[in-house]
């Protein structure tokens, strides 16, 4: 997935936006001044959070509910966002790279599609995975997802867009006190 890198000071055609792979964070998304040096910006990103864990002591299993928080930035259509049919009957589309495309910008509220394409890509990967590392995806619990809401309403953070997905994983619950006794 490649998404637009935000530039909070530019929302017109003069901004030659850059596409980047989203950053990944655990627990929280750091502020712009606290991002690691190799990360251009905290958005676009996915943040992995542990929501809840349950140990089944009789089955020696641990279920962990994971929440993925997705963020994207998109103030509107820039010229290179628009693809035109190639015109040779192949069904192929080509990206515009010309002077007219470079100066084209329409501010709109369609940037939510970037966040949802990001979510959809992650959902497909999770749905098709049996395991994530040595953790089993608990498919029988399903996946839930939605837009970020406040008091049951989707807040307007234009040009930033947010969504989430939750699923459960399982690991074998093993206790080996010798391996961590020295830490107690």
Sequence positions of predicted segments:
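Hydrophobic beta-strand residues in large extracellular and virion-surface proteins
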Residues: 1, 46-48, 66-68, 126, ...
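Localized chelating/binding microdomains
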Residues: 1-10, 16-20, 74-76, 100, ...
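Small/polar-rich, solvent-exposed N-terminal microdomains that initiate assembly or binding
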Residues: 1-60, 183-184
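Glycine-rich, flexible loop segments associated with nucleotide phosphate handling
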Residues: 17-20, 38-43, 103-118, 158-160
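Short, internal active-site loops enriched in acidic
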Residues: 25, 33-34, 53-54, 73, ...
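Oligomerization/assembly interface segments of phage tail-like spikes and tubes
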Residues: 60-81, 85-109, 122, 157-175
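Acidic-leaning, charged glycine-interspersed low-complexity segments
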Residues: 109-172
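Mature extracytoplasmic or otherwise solvent-exposed domains
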Residues: 176-180, 184
């Amino acid at each position: 997935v490649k998404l637009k890198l935000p530039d909070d000071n530019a929302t017109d055609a003069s901004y030659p936006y850059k596409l980047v792979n989203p950053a990944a964070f655990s627990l929280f998304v750091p502020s712009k001044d606290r991002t690691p040096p190799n990360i251009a910006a905290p958005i676009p990103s996915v943040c992995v959070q542990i929501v809840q864990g349950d140990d089944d002591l009789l089955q020696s299993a641990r279920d962990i509910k994971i929440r993925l928080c997705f963020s994207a930035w998109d103030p509107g259509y820039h010229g290179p966002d628009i693809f035109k049919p190639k015109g040779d009957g192949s069904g192929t589309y080509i990206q515009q790279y010309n002077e007219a495309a470079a100066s084209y910008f329409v501010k709109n509220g369609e940037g939510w599609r970037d966040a949802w394409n990001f979510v959809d890509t992650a959902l497909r990967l999770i749905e098709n995975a049996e395991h994530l590392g040595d953790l089993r995806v608990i498919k029988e619990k399903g996946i839930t997802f939605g837009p970020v809401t406040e008091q049951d309403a989707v807040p307007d953070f234009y040009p930033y867009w947010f969504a989430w997905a939750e699923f459960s994983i399982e690991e074998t619950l093993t206790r080996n006190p010798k391996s961590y006794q020295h830490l107690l």
